């Protein structure tokens, strides 16, 4: 039997969101050249029964169970270790792709770009609103010839707003930080240091969906500490490569002041 050629590997970390995961997978076209790698981060057995999912019969879905846990960063690294596609895309299990995805994939299947950045919607289910992603600002500014590509590479840092040539990731051993939050930022920034042939598309390909209970909106001190340490790493790397835009630490601390023990404030400013 001839082995199918995989052009696109979709990597989706998952934990305890079976219905939303099903919705995400259904937004990805079923094609011979696509594989969807779902890495389950030790979901609760009373919440998830993977044997009952409609997509369990799809030939393009690969389920990897990580019983040791480790968070989304660990799950994405496992996905990278198992991906076979020429291109990689990342999705969160509670998000979806737009109807533009299929044509977008066809447009770049044989291109020689290292990376293609694309636009996203933000759908706010918390306040029943819908607005453009702030990350589109970097893309729109660049496409209007008022910005530079460095701001796109280092500003549009979410993993899900880009089509990535897998060989760039493998050859440079670019990995996700295996922490509970902010695990994706340094991956994208390190990736930006290595990509040379870059395309920026005005197509809206991804729906980022805000909902109650998502880690991005969990008011946790641990999330703050992870974010703070990531910003230190981020600024250190920016300094190393000569990129002038940095995260202003006092502003970050002010914005997150409710998470900080006032007696410990000095150690963040030293």
What feature does the model see in each segment?
Residues 16, 28, 41-45, 70, ...:
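Conserved short acidic donor-positioning loop in nucleotide-sugar-dependent glycosyltransferases
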Residues 25-65:
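Acidic donor-binding segment of Leloir-type glycosyltransferases
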Residues 6-9, 27, 35, 186:
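Cell-envelope/extracellular polymer assembly enzymes that use nucleotide-activated donors
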Residues 88:
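Short aromatic/hydrophobic "clamp" motif used to bind/position activated sugar donors
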Residues 66-83:
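Glycine-rich, basic loop-to-helix element that forms the pyrophosphate-binding segment
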Residues 2, 30, 57, 180, ...:
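C-terminal subregions of glycosyltransferases and related glycan-biosynthesis enzymes
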Residues 13-30:
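Short, well-formed alpha-helical segments that are part of the catalytic scaffolds
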Residues 72-76, 93-198, 209-224, 228:
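Donor-binding/catalytic cores of nucleotide-activated saccharide
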């Amino acid at each position: 039997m001839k082995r199918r050629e995989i052009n696109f590997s979709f990597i989706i970390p998952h934990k305890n969101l079976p219905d939303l995961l099903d919705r995400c997978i259904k937004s990805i076209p079923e094609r011979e050249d696509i594989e969807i790698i779902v890495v389950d981060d030790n979901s609760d057995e009373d919440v998830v029964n993977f044997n009952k999912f409609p997509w369990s019969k799809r030939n393009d879905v690969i389920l990897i169970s990580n019983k040791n846990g480790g968070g989304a960063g660990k799950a994405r690294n496992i996905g990278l270790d198992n991906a076979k596609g020429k291109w990689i895309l990342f999705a969160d299990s509670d998000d979806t792709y737009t109807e533009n995805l299929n044509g977008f994939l066809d447009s770049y299947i044989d291109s020689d770009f290292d990376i293609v950045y694309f636009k996203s919607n933000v759908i706010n289910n918390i306040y029943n609103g819908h607005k453009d992603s702030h990350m589109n600002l970097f893309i729109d500014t660049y496409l209007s010839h008022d910005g530079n590509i460095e701001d796109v590479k280092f500003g549009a840092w979410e993993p899900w707003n880009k089509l990535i040539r897998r060989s760039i990731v493998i050859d440079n051993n670019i990995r996700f930080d295996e922490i509970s939050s902010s695990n994706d930022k340094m991956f994208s920034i390190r990736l930006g240091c290595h990509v040379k042939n870059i395309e920026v598309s005005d197509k809206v390909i991804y729906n980022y969906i805000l909902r109650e209970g998502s880690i991005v909106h969990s008011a946790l001190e641990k999330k703050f500490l992870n974010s703070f340490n990531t910003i230190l790493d981020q600024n250190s790397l920016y300094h190393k490569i000569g990129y002038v835009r940095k995260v202003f630490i006092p502003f970050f601390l002010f914005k997150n002041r409710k998470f900080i023990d006032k007696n410990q404030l000095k150690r963040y400013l030293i």
